[in-house]
Amino acid sequence: DAFRILKGKGYQAKTVLITAKEKMCVCEEMDCNPQNCPYAEGHFDRVNDAVFELLQKEEIFTREIFLEQAHRHRVCPFELCLDTASWADNIICDYNYVFDPNVYLRRFFAEGTKEEYLFLVDEAHNLVERARSMYSAVLVKEDFLAVKKLVKPYSKKVAAELEKCNKILLAYKRECEDYQICENISNFAFALMRFGAAADTFLQKSTEFPGKKEFLDLYLKVRHFLNMYERLDEHYVIYTQFLENHSFMIKLFCVDPALNLQECLDKGRSTIFFSATL
């Protein structure tokens, strides 16, 4: 609304509103494999024309505009949005596209260098808690057992690595009454790395198999856990805990995300925080 008011006063600039990928997807089930998605198939052959056409006729780009253009050119609406954002003067988006280590906009921040970005952070009182969540990581023991059963018929190697992870978690579980602070989990981290390497090899050879969704879900959680493990310092606490459903988890909890946030903010020239609560 603010940019529409500015436009009405003569402001000329391109403004993109980024909507979550799940809300942009036009398929019944989100699967970005070109074999399963007609919008992904041949996307890169058509997307440049779609972006160029949009830039010629619009100044404020919303979800509805991207969906309409995606249908017209049969391209992925989310990727169309991101490609258009590369030409924008203003980008409106959720915190995670700047701060989340998993989904930040790599086309803008991957180089890690300071650029001429100005960050306007609204609802700033929520940022610390959101950042704690983004830079923490959780793994649940029962997930390793469940995925092991699914993948064992297709890869005994991956199943064996999952079992090693499960055994370490079982040892942690036996030491834990309700929750337990962990000083050193290097043996578990190495087991996760071995699982990750085996999973990479397996995924290169096996494109489709029953239980792939659950497998990928755990695989991505493990990758995030290892990425956060590399960030461990005095601002983190590692602990294990029994959950309400009697499952058992291990968590890397980012108590103070200040350094992680500053690392992101340093990629821009200036930041202004807004909050009606603070």
Feature locations, PLM:
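Short glycine-/polar-rich loops that comprise or flank the Walker A/P-loop
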Residues: Y11-K14, K114-Y117, G268-R269
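Signature of the SF2 helicase/ATPase Hel1-core->accessory helical subdomain module
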Residues: H71-G196, F273-L278
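A substrate-engagement module of RecA-like helicase motors
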Residues: D1-I91, F99, K149, A160, ...
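General structural signal for secondary-structure boundaries
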Residues: F61-E64, V140, I185-A189, V255, ...
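Short amphipathic alpha-helical interaction/hinge segments
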Residues: V26, V128, E230-D233
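A contiguous, basic/glycine-rich beta-loop/short-helix subdomain that forms a polymer-engagement track
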Residues: F66-S86, I91, N102-F109, A198-L278
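Hydrophobic packing residues within well-ordered alpha-helices of enzyme cores
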Residues: A2-L6, L127, L261
